[in-house]
Amino acid sequence: MSSPKRSSKPSMSLAPSGSSMPTADPKPPASLKSTKSATPNRSLVPTKPATSRNSVMSPSSSKSTKSTSTKRAPSNRPSSRSRVRSKARTPSRVSTDTRTSKASKASDVRCHQRRGTHSRGRTPGRRGSRSSKRSPSRASTPGRIRTHGARPGMASRVRTPTSQQKGSRGKSYGRPRTSNRERSDSQPRNLSKKSYRPPGGSGIGRSSELAVTPSTAKCQTPTGIPSKEKSDNPSPSSSRKVKSYGQMIIPSREKSYSPTEMSSRVKSYNQASTRSRPQSHSQSRSPRRSRSGSQKRTHSRVRSHSWKRNHSRARSRTRKGILSQMGRHSQSRSHSKGKSQNQSRTPRRGRSHNWSRNPSKERSHSHSRSSSKERDHRGSSSPRKESGRSQSGSPNKQRDHSRSRSPNKARDRSRSRSPYKARDRSRSRSPNKARDCSRSRSPYKARDRSRSRSPNKARDHSRSRSPNKARDRSRSRSPSKERDHSQLGSPSKERDHRRSRSPSKERQCRQSRSSSKERDHRRSRSPSKERQRRQSRSPNKERDRSQSRSPSEEREHRQSRSPSKERDRRRWRSPSKERERRQSRSSSEERDHSRSRSPNKQSGYSRPRASSKEKAHSRSRTPSKEGNHSQSRTSSKESDPSQSTVPRSPDWKRSPTRTSSLSQNRTPSKTSSHSPSTFPSGGQTLSQDDSQADATTSKATLPGERSSSSSSKLA
């Protein structure tokens, strides 16, 4: 009953928004920045935004989404809320009931973020802009939101403005709410975080909103967000702010109070189901700090649940956006980066394919997972596999991505949206991967996509969807290798660097067509394969790898160039990796091949070339597999070059040389010897790549050159 009322209001709002929409649209960029996470919602509800808008008639969607919108609108300023809401929520709000389940999170998160963002500017125009803005925002959000990977920053930025705008309202929790919520919304919104964190805001906002009857009344109607917003526009900033939080955060509570309590509850449950924990945290009326803690705490935790659902979506976005916020999640997630990327990676990779539309999403999710989330994307690229799988999920999607460690992991890895995922994808080096990378909504995804030379790799990297996350995820794929990549690797860089040591490396991989030469070139970039392998591997690649890996790793690389190094590297990689690598050395090679996504496919495609490539792909595919399995796939042979190539995986993947390298790597003895060395190098090359990514940024210019290299090579 209230829903229709609200629906009508949103419709009305939509009309005003129509004209306000341009104005509202301008805000979306800022909002989008913070709404990066919102994009995951868009990803989550890619069609839903339109459907939701069209679905305005659907009371359920209107209820929940509006509820969420209502929650947030008051919290954010009338303008912010209206803007954000109109932007993200009004169209959705009206149709949000339908969208509530799906769009509730998406819209909620997006609206939350967007509201926070838009709350800055359009206090007055917010009403009109609300519907329009929300719709455009929805439409715009994907690109815009996706683009800004600094969702946490943006969210914070936006949050602050929102808070500032809300200034009179409850800057205390207006901002935290906006910050946390925006962050939460940015992250959890996609995951459960939004609800859980917004509930923190909700507790605050709800309290305020409860106090703010106009807001509450508005919030009462599912579609009441327009009412609420309209009422809120008249309402004091405080009401609005509280309402924004209340509406946004209190879809469940505020709505519980309101007639649309069911809507609120539905949303709360939808969100609370997804964001139940987060909402509990947030809704516990924790102040922004609690919510901040909640959001961070629940980033991991909530991400676990919702995230598994939405891991990819929110994670991609949140990863980038919540990079800083997720820093701890990145660490938590991927040990630091690996975790984040792993989490983001696995689900994101899986979903990254699906949700690739949010480049930022994976970024947001990956980064959302941790400040290092971008690091998770980038740095956690190697981690992203592991943690991407582990905690890939940024709030919703990301959480789903990363945390959703499951077959979705492959998808999640793809879902692991992160620029670095693209990198990983580039690393994955395959049209599929590239496609996944593309889906992996992230520039870096494209990079990874480039890297995703092969479908397998692409798939793996799709899994490793956020380049870092995907990479992490890929790496995480094989817990050891991925973990090593995650732990060791500067996720994206490293892996990209490792893989995409540089076009040169790749070239050398290509040059390294010769088994010995190629392997050494892969390792060394120089015909002097052994010397270069030692030199490049030890001094150059190893140094890079080790460097990236760590001074110790480098040392280990150099020292461990011998089986010792390999052992150390393997050790460094992890027992699993070591085991895998060692196993790879022996029957493990075939086992690793099997382990590889397509053991035969990758190992067996053209064992020399297709297999190598496929192995490289496999390597990409299961970054772990890719590094370990792919490399292990060519356990002895490919293992070394694979390992060498895992670091060069991008190169390899980028170039058939990698395949040749792999082929060459087929030489079990030589490669095997180096395999652990090199592959650990690969894992450590992640670290090395981290360093090398840093040191070799010019070399690979992680994002750009790697993208270029990956893309070029992919192309």
Swiss-Prot record:
<feature type="compositionally biased region" description="Low complexity">
    <location>
        <begin position="60"/>
        <end position="79"/>
    </location>
</feature>
<feature type="compositionally biased region" description="Polar residues">
    <location>
        <begin position="657"/>
        <end position="666"/>
    </location>
</feature>
<feature type="compositionally biased region" description="Polar residues">
    <location>
        <begin position="92"/>
        <end position="104"/>
    </location>
</feature>
<feature type="compositionally biased region" description="Basic residues">
    <location>
        <begin position="522"/>
        <end position="536"/>
    </location>
</feature>
<feature type="compositionally biased region" description="Low complexity">
    <location>
        <begin position="667"/>
        <end position="681"/>
    </location>
</feature>
<feature type="compositionally biased region" description="Polar residues">
    <location>
        <begin position="213"/>
        <end position="224"/>
    </location>
</feature>
<feature type="compositionally biased region" description="Polar residues">
    <location>
        <begin position="32"/>
        <end position="59"/>
    </location>
</feature>
<feature type="compositionally biased region" description="Basic residues">
    <location>
        <begin position="286"/>
        <end position="320"/>
    </location>
</feature>
<feature type="compositionally biased region" description="Polar residues">
    <location>
        <begin position="257"/>
        <end position="272"/>
    </location>
</feature>
<feature type="compositionally biased region" description="Basic residues">
    <location>
        <begin position="80"/>
        <end position="90"/>
    </location>
</feature>
<feature type="compositionally biased region" description="Low complexity">
    <location>
        <begin position="273"/>
        <end position="285"/>
    </location>
</feature>
<feature type="compositionally biased region" description="Basic and acidic residues">
    <location>
        <begin position="539"/>
        <end position="595"/>
    </location>
</feature>
<feature type="compositionally biased region" description="Basic residues">
    <location>
        <begin position="112"/>
        <end position="136"/>
    </location>
</feature>
<feature type="compositionally biased region" description="Basic and acidic residues">
    <location>
        <begin position="611"/>
        <end position="628"/>
    </location>
</feature>
<protein>
    <recommendedName>
        <fullName>Serine/arginine repetitive matrix protein 5</fullName>
    </recommendedName>
</protein>
<feature type="compositionally biased region" description="Low complexity">
    <location>
        <begin position="1"/>
        <end position="13"/>
    </location>
</feature>
<feature type="compositionally biased region" description="Basic and acidic residues">
    <location>
        <begin position="359"/>
        <end position="388"/>
    </location>
</feature>
<feature type="region of interest" description="Disordered">
    <location>
        <begin position="1"/>
        <end position="715"/>
    </location>
</feature>
<feature type="compositionally biased region" description="Basic and acidic residues">
    <location>
        <begin position="397"/>
        <end position="521"/>
    </location>
</feature>
<feature type="compositionally biased region" description="Polar residues">
    <location>
        <begin position="682"/>
        <end position="715"/>
    </location>
</feature>
